[in-house]
């Protein structure tokens, strides 16, 4: 059932409506576990759109297995998704820096407060993100160290390739994930793929993890997908490789593969002169290539 969480006219023109799709078993009303999937806070990140679609499709294909509530929020920033804009169009504001909001505040504070209020009561919330247009990332859970102990058991069930502790601003203060965790709703940030793009293989991998979590929580009684054991890293265990030259980077290895000491990772080339300006290799790689 599609429900409108909030609907408002924008001061600069246009209309903003945030909707959720609530899928629940028929005839069961009380004491149901609930999972919430949130996507589209940044309108240029489309990987979560596929995950929302595929989760809803699988649930509706076998409604007899559903024993809890699945809430799907495909577009928290619907205007941004319409225009493939990271920020809220016309306002040029990053929605993921406005939580938990204020019911008595300005327009965007009221919107974010309403979203938070609608998510309270969830047994788990998963906030879906993609990388930017320049980087493709393997499926990974990003955790703040403040909540890592409580969230790690859930994170291991997501079927992600990696769990990255304290990795990014997407889990820090004023974000949806940080606010919901402070309010007692376990919330994971899942990041994968690339901006302005959808990778079905990554999406299917994470949807399998979502159904594994739902099975463990008693929300889903159908076949339980198997999940892999993720690598777990902190900031100090992730190697960043930066070029010393300008130009175009051409990778020479596959995404998400192990590398050995001294392996050639890629080249920085000059398209004007037809020359290689720098060969990128790493003498001390300890993990897989996570991004490309």
Role assignments for model-derived ranges:
Residues 1-292:
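Structured catalytic-domain cores with a bias toward divalent-metal coordination
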């Amino acid at each position: 059932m599609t429900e409108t969480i909030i609907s408002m006219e924008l001061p600069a023109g246009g209309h903003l409506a945030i909707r959720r799709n609530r899928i629940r078993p028929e005839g069961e009303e009380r004491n149901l576990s609930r999972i919430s999937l949130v996507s589209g806070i940044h309108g240029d990140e489309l990987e979560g759109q596929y995950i929302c679609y595929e989760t809803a499709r699988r649930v509706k294909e076998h409604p007899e297995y559903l024993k809890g509530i699945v809430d799907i929020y495909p577009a928290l920033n619907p205007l941004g998704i319409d225009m493939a804009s990271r920020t809220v169009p016309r306002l040029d504001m990053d929605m993921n820096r406005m939580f938990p909001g204020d019911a008595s505040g300005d327009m965007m504070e009221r919107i974010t407060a309403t979203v938070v209020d609608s998510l309270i009561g969830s047994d788990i919330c998963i906030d879906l993100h993609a990388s930017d247009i320049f980087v493709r990332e393997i499926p990974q859970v990003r955790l703040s160290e403040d909540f890592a102990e409580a969230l790690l058991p859930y994170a291991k069930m997501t079927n992600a390739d990696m769990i990255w502790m304290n990795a990014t601003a997407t889990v820090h203060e004023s974000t949806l994930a940080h606010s919901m965790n402070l309010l007692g709703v376990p919330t994971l940030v899942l990041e994968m793929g690339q901006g302005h793009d959808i990778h079905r293989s990554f999406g299917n991998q994470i949807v399998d993890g979502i159904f594994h979590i739902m099975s463990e929580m008693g929300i889903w009684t159908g076949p339980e997908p198997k999940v892999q054991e993720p690598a777990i890293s902190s900031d100090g265990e992730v190697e960043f490789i930066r070029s010393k030259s300008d130009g175009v980077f051409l990778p020479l290895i596959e995404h998400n593969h192990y590398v050995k000491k001294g392996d050639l990772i890629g080249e920085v080339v000059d398209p004007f002169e037809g020359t290689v300006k720098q060969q990128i290799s790493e003498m001390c790689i300890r993990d897989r290539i996570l991004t490309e």
